């Protein structure tokens, strides 16, 4: 999240006249993230104060956005803890604001857990599997817009900024993934709507009366798309279950997340055989996007681009850990 488009409280108050949400009490920009303009919104209605998140979309279009917003509504209706879009009086959940698409969603309770333990990871794995199953009958379809075709397109733009070793790594890995994506094994993998960006800062935990952290929900679905479920798991493991300094997988956390996921949606032998390929794909996707954001940034208030070397390091670690015969490697959580 970030703020590319600034708005005043008065502007928001006028825009909100089309909603039954009451009066604006506070509007506060959210600094984290790099894609859209986001604000915490406090409203007072009939003596009650409620919290929302306002998002102004900087890249996604009115045509693309219904996929994401209706997916969130679909999941929320099925008991998955995600932000629910708030409709205006006319029933629409997407409206123009300062010439760009904008929406309001409920604000989930809790705070991000940036130093997760095995229990946090288990809760994430359980809910991720339930989310995949709940989304299986979602009727809209849109591919993951940051998948292989985008990596190949973006490669040409970022190569001039890389040294020889980085260029060789990027080109080799994109070629490897292109071959994997073209394989019969890849085509056979289970798929459906995926979050595709489920990092530590895109989930919230609440502390209960006993002091235990409970998962409050997932948010920021604006990179979601139809993809292989295993890719979504790999992206999640590559963030939640690593040593941030080295990129190494933490076995205890990884096993906790994967066992919890596997208990809800058992993974297949084909998924086991290509787990390493997907870990590499997940690392590559974010190395490419962070290189692009770092070297070809957009102007924005509060923009904080991420260090691309983090995912370069993770990709190299996954390559170093590649078993001699990946197809015979057992599932890492069994």
Curated annotation (Swiss-Prot):
Species lineage: Bacteria, Pseudomonadati, Pseudomonadota, Betaproteobacteria, Burkholderiales
What Gene Ontology terms describe what this protein does at the molecular function level? ATP binding; homoserine kinase activity
What's the encoding gene here?
Answer: thrB
Q: Report whether Transport shows up as a keyword of the record.
A: no
Write down the species.
Cupriavidus taiwanensis (strain DSM 17343 / BCRC 17206 / CCUG 44338 / CIP 107171 / LMG 19424 / R1)
Q: Where are the transmembrane segments?
A: none
Q: From its record, what is one biological process in GO terms?
A: threonine biosynthetic process
Which keywords does this chain's UniProt record carry?
Answer: Amino-acid biosynthesis, ATP-binding, Kinase, Nucleotide-binding, Threonine biosynthesis, Transferase
PANTHER family xref list: AMINOGLYCOSIDE PHOSPHOTRANSFERASE DOMAIN-CONTAINING PROTEIN, AMINOGLYCOSIDE PHOSPHOTRANSFERASE DOMAIN-CONTAINING PROTEIN-RELATED
Q: Which Enzyme Commission number(s) are on file for it?
A: 2.7.1.39
**What NCBIfam families has UniProt attached to this entry?**
PRK05231.1 (NF003558), thrB_alt (TIGR00938)
Any single Pfam family the record assigns to this protein: APH
Q: In which pathway does it act?
A: Amino-acid biosynthesis; L-threonine biosynthesis; L-threonine from L-aspartate: step 4/5
Q: Key word Amino-acid biosynthesis present in the record?
A: yes
Q: What is this protein called?
A: Homoserine kinase
